[in-house]
Amino acid sequence: MKILEIKNLCKVYGSGDTKVDALKNVSFDIEQGEFVAIIGPSGSGKSTLLHILGGVDTPSSGEVIISGTDISKLNETKLAIFRRRQIGLIYQFYNLIPILNVEENMTLPILLDGKKPDKKLLRDLVNKLGLKERVTHLPNQLSGGQQQRVSIGRALMNHPALLLADEPTGNLDSENSKEIIALLRKFNRENKQTVIIITHDERIALSADRVITIEDGKITKDSGRRGLSA
């Protein structure tokens, strides 16, 4: 089942002499349960693409269809609701709230949506992420790897259709990087969680089911599906 369809996606910044074509007629689709790495040099358009997929930015033209909804047609309010309920975002810098503990950071998006957190899911995530002894700790009491685990848990609390990660290991050492990717793979395999990662790290790309290369705003290579996670 297609979880994501991108059709003739374009993104233009500025106009006239300052015009920049960040994305140029990008088209591809992703099946539910895929683990996809998007790679490319700095300025290639890969982060712009991820921001559009995450509903953080809007396209100049084209379609972005997630779970049957074309988010490019949504107004700002509906897009914010869709993003909160259907998309999990993980960044290089963890973006945790300093005055909230681990549990509070993980459940904040659910509370902002006016819902009660799923306590069973919270316990399950805390255990799988190795944070059981850290639930009352503040971000400044955690290591970088632990903070990124919290951000992963926060992103998964809403059962997202898509889990999007922008350089999730870029601020971590090699050992913590391996652990974070292993965790993302674990959720991908066990829960059929669709994962898209923007990365410069070739080791991460090699661990993906599929690698899409972007250069100068265009897809220049797509490895194709090497088989969905079982």
What residue ranges belong to the model's regions?
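Conserved beta-strand-loop-alpha-helix hinge in the C-terminal portion
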Residues: 218-230
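ABC family nucleotide-binding domain
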Residues: 2-214
